[in-house]
């Protein structure tokens, strides 16, 4: 496939500020929310490749998720909103099984197909540096949702996951004022978004008589996620709360609680706006969920990539992070939040 001419330069990791704000926070005034301030991105190398294309060059952009989940439908809606506004088509690809091998192959294929920019949610940051760095030598690479700060990616867009964990930890303390036993459920703790959320939770619950008795990974296997929840309920008869760090974990934990007849006895806190999660908040099976803004992750990642391709590091903010924000959704503000979601999805 014909590659268009480009100017590739090596630049310092932090460039001039590009003025673009993140999303606003939704929900009612009673909801807790957190929009973190930007923090400097850690980098392994003093310089990173950026690729600037001549004016008029047709730009090929791609968005790569880390698995197939409802969460990415909202990001896809953001990508489509960008397409409608700019007329630039963006390829949206998802690794069907959520494996590193699949995602690496997608990256390599996009390079071969002559793409100019990729926004990617990295599955295992420390294990994929070689693949990411190789791609960055041929195209503009940014991370979204799950970061790989030691790679040659140019910037990160998404949740500041440690701060999201702090918010979740505060909600856990609120739900367990006398303390108790907590179990953590997650797809893959090697993913930076997952372990940073857990770091935040562990920081907040210290000194509150709250003990994490289990940390269960499922590798994006829903059947395994459900059995993990069932096994923990059986193993810990005094379990107080189940905490899901991936979008599907909360609802699957709640279904296990319901099956065990422990509704009300075992509290559940989730992550993200999965439809089953929101339904379980309505029925009282889930107490609260920490929601991100995947719509803005999709939209902003495309917008920044487009501008980087045209203007180089002048389009990268300083620090090289854009926080899309998080908030707590519970029974009090659920109706308002669902209206906000419906408006977002109308863009797809």
Which ranges hold each PLM region?
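Short beta-strand elements in bilobed, periplasmic/extracellular small-molecule ligand-binding domains
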Residues: 84-97, 181-184, 205-222
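Extracytoplasmic "Venus flytrap"
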Residues: 46-78, 82-83, 91-105, 115, ...
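Short, solvent-exposed amphipathic alpha-helices that sit
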Residues: 71-88, 164-168, 192-211, 224, ...
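Hydrophobic alpha-helical segments within soluble ligand-binding/sensing domains
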Residues: 103, 157-182, 224-226, 273-277, ...
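Hinge/cleft segment of the Venus flytrap/periplasmic-binding protein
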Residues: 36, 40-57, 189, 193, ...
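Hydrophobic alpha-helical
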Residues: 111, 119-136, 201, 219-280
């Amino acid at each position: 496939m014909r590659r268009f001419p480009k100017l590739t330069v090596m630049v310092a990791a932090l460039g001039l500020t590009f003025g673009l704000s993140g999303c606003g926070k939704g929900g009612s005034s009673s909801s807790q929310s957190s929009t973190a301030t930007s923090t400097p991105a850690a980098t392994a190398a003093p310089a990173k490749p950026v690729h600037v294309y001549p004016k008029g060059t047709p730009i090929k952009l791609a968005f790569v998720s880390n698995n197939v989940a409802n969460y990415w439908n909202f990001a896809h809606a953001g990508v489509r909103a960008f397409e409608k506004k700019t007329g630039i088509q963006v390829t949206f690809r998802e690794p069907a099984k959520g494996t590193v091998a699949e995602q690496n192959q997608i990256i390599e294929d996009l390079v071969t197909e002559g793409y100019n920019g990729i926004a990617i949610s990295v599955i295992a940051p420390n294990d994929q540096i070689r693949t990411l760095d190789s791609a960055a030598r041929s195209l503009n690479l940014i991370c979204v949702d799950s970061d790989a700060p030691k790679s040659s990616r140019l910037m990160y867009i998404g949740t500041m996951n440690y701060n999201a964990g702090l918010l979740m930890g505060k909600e856990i303390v609120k739900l367990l004022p006398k303390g108790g036993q907590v179990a953590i459920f997650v797809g893959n703790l090697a993913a930076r978004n997952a372990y940073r959320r857990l770091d935040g939770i562990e920081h907040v619950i210290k000194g509150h008589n709250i003990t994490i008795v289990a940390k269960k990974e499922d590798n994006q296997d829903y059947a395994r996620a459900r059995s993990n929840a069932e096994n923990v309920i059986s193993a810990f008869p005094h379990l107080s709360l189940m905490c899901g760090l991936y979008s599907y974990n909360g609802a699957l934990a709640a279904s296990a609680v319901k099956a065990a007849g422990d509704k009300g006895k075992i509290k559940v806190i989730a992550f993200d706006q999965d439809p089953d999660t929101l339904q379980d908040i309505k029925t009282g099976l889930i107490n609260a969920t920490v929601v991100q803004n995947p719509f803005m992750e999709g939209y902003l990642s495309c917008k920044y990539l487009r501008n980087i391709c045209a203007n180089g590091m002048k389009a990268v903010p300083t620090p090289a992070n854009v926080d899309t924000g998080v908030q707590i959704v519970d029974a009090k503000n659920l109706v308002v939040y669902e209206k906000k979601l419906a408006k977002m999805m109308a863009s797809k």
